[in-house]
Every structure is written in structure tokens, then in C-alpha cells.
Amino acid sequence: MSLFGSSPPNDGSAALNPAKTANSSRSTLFDNEAPTTRSGSALFADDDHDSPWDMPTPRKQRSRADLIRNLLPSGDVPESYIETFDAVVRTENRSTNGRITAGGVARTLAAAKLGADDQARIMGIIAPASASATGAGGGGDGAHGGEANSSAAAAAAAVGLGDLGRNEFNVLLALIGLVQEGEVASLDGVDERRRNLPQPKLQGLVNENVQPMLPNLSELGAKPPQRPVTPPKAPTPSPPKQQQQQQHQPPTLRKVSMEYPEDPWNAPDLHKGHNHGPLEHSTGHNGAADVPRSVANDLNGNDAVSYSTSPEVTTTSSALPGRTTSTFTTSQPPSGPSSIHNVAESIQESNGAWNYFPGSSSGGGFGEPADNAITGPFGDSGGPGQSVSGSVGGSNPNRSIGHVRSGSNVEENILVTLMPEKEGVFMFQHHNYEVSSIRRGSKVVRRYSDFVWLLDCLHKRYPFRVLPLLPPKRVAFNGNHLSNDGAFIEKRRRGLARFLNALVRHPVLGQEQLVIMFLTVPTELSVWRKQATISVQDEFTGRTLPPGLEDSLPPTLEELFARTRVGVRRSAELYISTCTIMDRLIKRSEGVAADHARMAVSLISLTETSADTYATDHNDVPLLNDGLQAMGRHLRTAQTLMEDEAKAWEEGVLEDLKRQRDALVSLRDMFDRRDRLDKDNIPFLQRRIETNEAKLQALNAKPEGMVKPGEKERVVEAIIKDKESIVTQHNRSVFVKECIRDELRFFQNTQYNVSRLTQDWAQERVKYSEMLADNWRRLLDDLEGMPLGD
């Protein structure tokens, strides 16, 4: 007898199955037990039966996919999660667009070395459909199966799984970490550990692909400022809560992949033969909110090592021959702190959770380190014989033909997409471009004039650096502007992408505040420019000359500049011609493919007339038509292969050639700007100083009453101002030489881009040649049945 006068309709079934009753009465938020007994409409095992305590209008429930997508955003996970995602993405095909396929998930599960049951449970949470498909065969291996069984189970568990984005992959890594720590894999457990996520151990997955960001930087940077040796600072005590978190936090993947975190810019081979071992440093989460700045530096390994910048430590400056300088240039006038250092500090604080990719430094330039920070990106660290992994220009880092290069580092890739609709009134319409960065998690809309403004600001602030090129606004022929057709707009879009990628991969320009704001400010740039205070001062303004910097520059530097300029000018012309020839080759390949299609149509049409043509004897006509149809089919296949190859050339080797061409032309333009801007009037000032000194001696020789009041002071003040101007101009010329030298060292790595593009193109030629040869071999087999009349 019920309280309301009647019994529930399923009372009998509940009495027969008390376990089912217990399960149905349970109502929790993250109930992941017995997923097969849940209703398909419930999100977290909510009761299917109505309750008198239900709200009149229940809120709209989200699907499991939406929950997993929003459970662990990129800003809330450790940096090891981000590195693992990037490592798996590098092994994927280029067509994944930053997502991980089922094959990548299978490799991740295999690297975790979990049992088949644990893998099936994790896949049941990430993708219930795949778990049900593999649950029957995955339970018999046990948790202690061998590596082969683990790989097979991982591959089986990933069957039927769709592509995973960064957020879904974060949940997968958290579930793997929970299982490895002995906890139950569930979304409930992931949500409870949101602030202290487990660190999964994926042996062989990250170490084989992740290399130091910028190996070998001692040869590539200016020497740091020479200062007296100061005793190392005592480490800042961490708060008790932070210390406890560091004690219980498992080691991150960065510690595994970087053997020497105190020297992150150098390869491990540099430290072979040294009598020191790797220091222990703890790393924190990428997006920790309550960690003080000093503690964050300790977590990143930046404050653990004290770098001495004394003259004794600078080994190269003492070995170089001395340089005679004027007495005016040996003394330094008092000046305030370096404005470049202040700008870099503001950039460092505004980088957000990512802390700038591929590396952030609070130094002002290539060789200006900050206090207790790793010199970078061109500082005095590294060893000979190594190269910087950064590059000039931009291309898709995931593009790989044949195999994945394990030695290439992950580069930030800026995507530029043409918006479908134009903006503006008639006759004044313009295209908009969506600029997105997966690494920064930003997506903004910019127009072509915004790119022009950014480049103008960079020309004023960094006139002696390699500034990338912008594509033209319109194409002109004999002074007449041609129409902006779709092909030109597409070429301009690719040129804008190369421009931005060259900026963000430059060690100094990538940290410029204007560049960061250009990529991250979501509002219209013209509105932001009116509200923001923008400084476009020269980067050398207010910067003092460090002791020993001038002596560290070799005396043959000008000869090196002149020789490099001649080679760059000739190479730029040749690369411009090479890009034009490659463009013609692509057009011809497309034309040959179209001719194959026309020939296929003609052969198929011949089959319609064969019966009438050979009406005398119809016996061999069917075999003849079969051969013609097979010929047409394989010609169509050849057409498709040729079109695909032409498209691959256009998106691959042609873009790589243009990237190299832009780097050479940018360097050529930098030398031209130096001829215009690196000028001084030091000889004139020296002659005026000599004149004023002679005048001052004459005034001193006169009696007191014969000298006008204040005349001596005016002459002395003029001499002091001229000497200070000489010192400033001389220091600027030294900074310019140092800057150009560092730019040449950074540009030196473009030779490796040439090696990669030629190897990739050769692999593409081999791949498509083999596919075409296989197509013709199959055609030959199909033509064996044609009548020969023998």
C-alpha cells in the first residue's frame, strides 16, 4: 500500500531485482559505475524515474562530449600535458589540423603501459562506443601484460574513436595518470584533482620527439654585460602551502625530457665530459594563479643557477686583439635604467599562462640578460658545433613526407584564414583575415592595413633587424593595377602567414609588445591603437654600453658584413627566379593533368563507335572496348595523382622556397637600411671640440676683467655636450654591429631550411613517381586481355 494510495507500476520488478533498485536509487553527480545500465539520455547516471523533489523545469543537460571538452581547458593543465599533446601531434599526418586521431590515442595508451582492462575503462569514458566494441576482447590480458599485448590492446581500444582536440586529450592524460597512481579512472576523480592533476608516465613518447627548444646559443649571441661578480642570492622561501605541493607533486615530463634544466638552451651533448651532474629543479603548472613571482621563477628553473658575468668568465673577449678608442668613448655618462629592459619586463609579465613560445626572457636583446635569468635567446650559453632550431619565415611544421623528423622542434604556427565576407561600403570594401594561434589560444580579426601599420612600427623600433616582408596590396603591371582576383588574394593570405610566422619565431621580434598585442587583442586594432600608449623608440635608446662588448666584436666584422651582403644579394635574385620557375612547373603539371583527363574522355568516347567501326566482325569488339575503358580509368587516376602532386608542390616546396626568398630579401633590406640610418657626425664634433678647447684656453689666458660673465661656462657646456654626443653615437654604432652580427647568426640557420625543403621535395617526387608507376603497371595488367590478332 503506497502513501499516495497506489503502488508504483514497476514495484514487482524492483522486488525481484534488489540490485537494480539500489542502482536506480543512487543519484550522484559523477557516477561512472556500471555504464551499460544507464539511460542514453542521462549525462552522469541520473535517475530515469521522476522524483517529487525535481525542479519544475530541469536545466538542459549537456552531452558527455561537451563535458569532456570543457573539463580541462588548456590554461588549467601542467605544461607536460601541452608538451605531450604537441609530441603526439607531430607524429600525426598533416591533415589532422591540430587534432589527434585514433592512432595517436593508441600510441599514448601503449606508452602508458596499462593493462587491457584499464585501457578499456579509459576508452569507455572518452568514447563509450569504442569501449563497447572492444570490451569483449580486452579483459583477458590483465594489468601485467607484455608490451606487445599493451600495444595491441591500445590499438583495439582506439577503434571507432573520433579525433581528439587539446582539451579532450588533457582528460585522457589525466585518466591515465589516475590509473598509474592506483586510483579509479573516472571523470569524478579528474574533477577532484583539477588543481593537482596527476602526471602520466609515457616512456618513449615524449623523449624521442621533444628536443631542447634552442640548442647551441653560445655561438649565436652577444656576450652578456660584464659586471663584478656578486654572491648568489639566497633562495626565496616558498610558502608552506607551495612547499607541500612541491613535495607531493610527481615529476613532470619537462624534467624527463630536459636533462639539464638549468641550461635549457643547450643540447645534452654539450655537457658530456663535464664533472657536474644535472641539478634538480621543480617545475610548476603552467597556469598557476597564486604562486608569487619568485616562486614561479624557482619552479621554472630560472632562479636556481647564478650566472657570473665578470670579465674573467667572458673567455672570448680577452683573447681578441684590442681596439684603440677615443678618450671620449671610454667614459660613460650617467643614465637611467635601460628602456629596452623595461619593455622586455612588461612583455614577460603580459605573456599569460603560455609564458611565450618558444622561449621567454626578460633580457632586452640578443645578449642583454636580466638578473638571475637564463641569458637568451642569443646569450652566452651553449657550445660550438650546434645550431639554433628557430627559423626565419613560416611554414606548416607538421608537413612531413615519408617520415617524421624527430630532431625538429615544435614551432609556433600562426594560421591566417580569409574571412568569407568583405566589409565596408561600395568602392571601399576590404578583406578581413582571421589570425589564430593554437599555442596562444588566441583568435583575432585583422585587415591588410593593420599588417602595414605593424611593420611600420617595427621599422621604427628595430631598423637594424631582419624584418619579414609583407605581400603587396595589389599587383601592378606597367603602372596599371590589376584586379584582385581569387588567386591573388590566396597568395596574399599565404604571404601574411609567412610574415607573422617569421615574426613570432624571431627571438626578439616575437617578444615585442606590439606583436603580442597584434596577435591577442580581440578588439579592432584601429580602436585599440587610439586607446593604447604605443612606444616606437629605437631599441638602442637609453641603453648603456656594457664593458667589454666592443672588445668582444672581432675587428674583421665589417669585412664579414660586406662579404655576406654580396652573397645575400646574389642569392636573393636566384631564389626569386627559382620561385618563378617552380610556379611555372606547378602550372605545367596542372596542364598535363588536364590533358590526361581530355585523353580519357576521348578514349571512353571511342568505345561508343567501335561497334560501327569494326562492323565486319564483332567478336573482338568487347575486348577492345574493355581495354579502352581501362585506359581511360587509369588516365583519370594519373590525372588525380598529378593534380595532387601539383597541389603538394604549391603548398609545400613553393612555400618553403618563398620562405627562404623572404629571409634573403629581408636581410638584403636590412643592409640597405644600415647604409641610410647608421650614420654619425663624430668627425665634425671632434673638430668643434678642438675649436672650443682652443677658445677656452684663450679665455683662461685673458685677465679676469676681459672675459664676459658666463662665457667660459657656455664654452665648457658646449664641449661636454659634444663629448656626450660622441659617446652616444659611438655606443650606437657598437650596438648596431652587435645587432647585425646576431642577426647573421640567426640567419645562419636558414641553410637547414634549404636542406629540409630539398629532402621533402625529393621524397614527394619519389612518392608520386612510385604511385604513377604502380598505376601504369596495373594498367598493363588490365590491357593483357586486348585482342592482338595472333
Curated annotation (Swiss-Prot):
Keywords in alphabetical order: Cytoplasm, Membrane, Protein transport, Transport
Protein's membrane topology: Peripheral membrane protein
Biased composition (Low complexity): 241-252, 324-339, 386-400
Disordered: annotated segments: 1-62, 215-342, 373-406
Annotated InterPro entries: AH/BAR_dom_sf (IPR027267), PX_dom (IPR001683), PX_dom_sf (IPR036871), SNX8/Mvp1 (IPR028662), SNX8/Mvp1_PX (IPR035704), Snx8_BAR_dom (IPR045734)
Entries under SUPFAM superfamilies matching the protein: PX domain
Superkingdom assignment: Eukaryota
Compositionally biased residues, Basic and acidic residues: 269-283
Cell compartments where the protein resides: Cytoplasm; Membrane
Principal place of residence: cytoplasm
Binding site for a 1,2-diacyl-sn-glycero-3-phospho-(1D-myo-inositol-3-phosphate): R447, S449, K473, R492
GO cellular component, one term: endosome
GO MF assignments: phosphatidylinositol-3-phosphate binding
PX domain location: 411-525
PROSITE patterns (alphabetical): PX
Biased composition (Polar residues): 1-10, 20-40, 297-319
The UniProt record lists the keyword Transport: yes
Example of a GO biological process term: retrograde transport, endosome to Golgi
One Pfam family linked to the record: Snx8_BAR_dom
Family: Belongs to the sorting nexin family.
Function (record text): Required for vacuolar protein sorting.
Free-text domain note: The PX domain binds phosphatidylinositol 3-phosphate which is necessary for peripheral membrane localization.
Protein's name according to its UniProt entry: Sorting nexin mvp1
